Amino acid sequence: MSMQDPIADMLTRIRNGQAANKAAVTMPSSKLKVAIANVLKEEGFIEDFKVEGDTKPELELTLKYFQGKAVVESIQRVSRPGLRIYKRKDELPKVMAGLGIAVVSTSKGVMTDRAARQAGLGGEIICYVA
């Protein structure tokens, strides 16, 4: 049986890995997952990521902790295969009054809600991270 929502699986692996105090989590890789991992790294929610393997690439995320606590308090899927959520630039949400981020897939690539607002772009809201 094939996986229905690989992005939700990625977010669940991050959530479960931090709940179990794992140093890193691995998952099958895709271009979208790498783009999301890049946004999470730039925003300081994960330590690092790397892609290994040629025939079946694996994405390894190094999780980040601060004083023994997980940096990611909550990570939540918004747009899903059964119900896509699109927002215009003026409708982009502010997560936790600007303390968290919304990961947005735009025509110019995957970016945070702040970067999309600055670029004047709307798009699909992939997830909220706080």
Swiss-Prot record:
This is Small ribosomal subunit protein uS8. InterPro entries: Ribosomal_uS8, Ribosomal_uS8_CS, Ribosomal_uS8_sf. It holds the Pfam family Ribosomal_S8. Keywords: Repressor, Ribonucleoprotein, Ribosomal protein, RNA-binding, rRNA-binding, Translation regulation. One of its GO terms (biological process) is regulation of mRNA stability. PROSITE patterns: RIBOSOMAL_S8. Signal peptide: none annotated. Part of the 30S ribosomal subunit. Contacts proteins S5 and S12. One of the primary rRNA binding proteins, it binds directly to 16S rRNA central domain where it helps coordinate assembly of the platform of the 30S subunit. Protein S8 is a translational repressor protein, it controls the translation of the spc operon by binding to its mRNA. One of its GO terms (molecular function) is rRNA binding. Belongs to the universal ribosomal protein uS8 family. GO terms for cellular component: cytoplasm; cytosol; cytosolic small ribosomal subunit.
